[in-house]
């Protein structure tokens, strides 16, 4: 199974980074500007489910 890379975006500086880059600092913070509020990027693929 291929490892899926999770991407995050900083709400202050707008840079995109991975979880491994985020682990440089203690806690959950942007590795570039040290801001606490980050957002996980959703995958561009739409998940379709059948109607009941």
Swiss-Prot record:
Keyword vocabulary terms for this entry: Cytoplasm, DNA-directed RNA polymerase, Metal-binding, Nucleotidyltransferase, Transcription, Transferase, Zinc
Species assigned in the record: Pyrobaculum calidifontis (strain DSM 21063 / JCM 11548 / VA1)
EC number from the UniProt entry: 2.7.7.6
The name this protein goes by in its record: DNA-directed RNA polymerase subunit Rpo12
Cofactor binding notes: Binds 1 zinc ion.
Cellular component, GO annotation: cytoplasm; DNA-directed RNA polymerase complex
The protein's assembly and partners: Part of the RNA polymerase complex.
UniProt gene name: rpo12
Residues involved in Zn(2+) binding: 13, 30, 33
Lineage of origin: Archaea, Thermoproteota, Thermoprotei, Thermoproteales, Thermoproteaceae
